[in-house]
């Protein structure tokens, strides 16, 4: 059986789809998946053993110059790659009109997705041949697992979902694996940032622990923040610019991770590493860290500025058994 997945973004959403593949792989021996995903996240599906072909799409970039000759050529090549197979099923796990119209509609195969009541954008359901009712008040991982089970005709397992990508990195861990913590400090929303002075205070409080700390970054302004956080601390390393796979390798070797609510926090969860995520305004119940050893540290009044470094340090100590 060959199935096409349409789940293009974001990083967390793409990662949250992986346990559904593991369920399907266990329920339907020999099943293989192709996956349409935004080019920036194209490495992620390749880490799962059930994925045979990754088809990158660049809707975010294309829409800036949709009718230019180079972009038209890219769109034509994408359509040819998408239509090269006749699929037993096409599962649109994105639930948005944009992806349904520009990707799902063009694919060959019976198209499955969430129904009018439960799709993220109800109009997207008009592009599906089979519409499935998937209750909204459950974690995103469980919603996707249920969608795959209903689309492919098996019962959703009652056990916790398995991302099944940690083993991809086990044979190539950093030489200092287990000797450091990683602090993913960057996120896209201002109200999800933990103040820099709190990060620096936490780093100082860990001085006697013997643990080294690594700071990842993606954009230039994130690198500047990382440098400010590391200033004056000999045991803190600002990582070089890395591919997503490179960052994943560092996370896979971490003793533990302290993170804001960001894509790298979800990647840590997918790699089964102990992870303390500090939450302010977002609800971890529906889109938070999912998996083994995932710990939620809520800010008082949902205001991250009110969450002190001492409180996070105590949280680390109280959960030492999981770390």
Task: Identify the meaning behind each predicted range.
Residues 1-323:
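Catalytic machinery of carbohydrate-active enzymes
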């Amino acid at each position: 059986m060959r199935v096409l997945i349409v789940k293009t973004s974001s990083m967390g959403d793409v990662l949250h789809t992986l346990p559904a593949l593991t369920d399907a792989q266990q329920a339907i021996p020999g099943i293989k998946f192709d996956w349409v995903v935004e080019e920036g996240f194209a490495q992620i599906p390749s880490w799962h053993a059930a994925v045979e072909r990754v088809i990158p799409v660049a809707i975010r970039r294309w829409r800036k110059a949709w009718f230019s000759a180079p972009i038209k050529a890219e769109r034509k090549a994408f359509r040819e790659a998408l239509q090269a197979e006749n699929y037993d099923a096409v599962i649109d796990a994105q639930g948005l009109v944009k992806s349904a119209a520009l990707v799902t509609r063009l694919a060959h195969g019976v198209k499955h997705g969430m129904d009018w009541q439960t799709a993220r954008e109800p109009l997207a359901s008009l592009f599906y041949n089979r519409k499935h009712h998937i209750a909204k008040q459950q974690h995103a991982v469980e919603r996707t697992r249920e969608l795959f089970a209903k689309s492919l005709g098996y019962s959703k397992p009652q056990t916790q979902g398995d991302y099944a990508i940690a083993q991809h990195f086990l044979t190539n861990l950093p030489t200092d694996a287990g000797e450091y913590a990683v602090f993913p400090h960057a996120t896209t929303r201002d109200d999800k940032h933990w103040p820099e002075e709190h990060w620096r205070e936490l780093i100082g409080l860990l001085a006697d622990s013997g643990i080294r700390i690594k700071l990842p970054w993606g954009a230039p302004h994130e690198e500047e923040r990382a440098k400010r956080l590391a200033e004056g601390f000999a045991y803190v390393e600002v990582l070089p610019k890395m591919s997503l796979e490179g960052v994943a390798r560092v996370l896979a070797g971490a003793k533990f991770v302290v993170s804001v609510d960001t894509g790298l926090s979800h990647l840590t969860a997918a790699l089964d590493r102990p992870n303390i995520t500090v939450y302010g305004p977002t609800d971890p119940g529906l889109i938070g860290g999912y998996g083994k050893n995932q710990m939620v540290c809520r800010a008082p009044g949902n205001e991250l500025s009110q969450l002190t470094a001492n409180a996070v340090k105590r949280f680390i100590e109280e959960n030492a058994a999981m770390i």
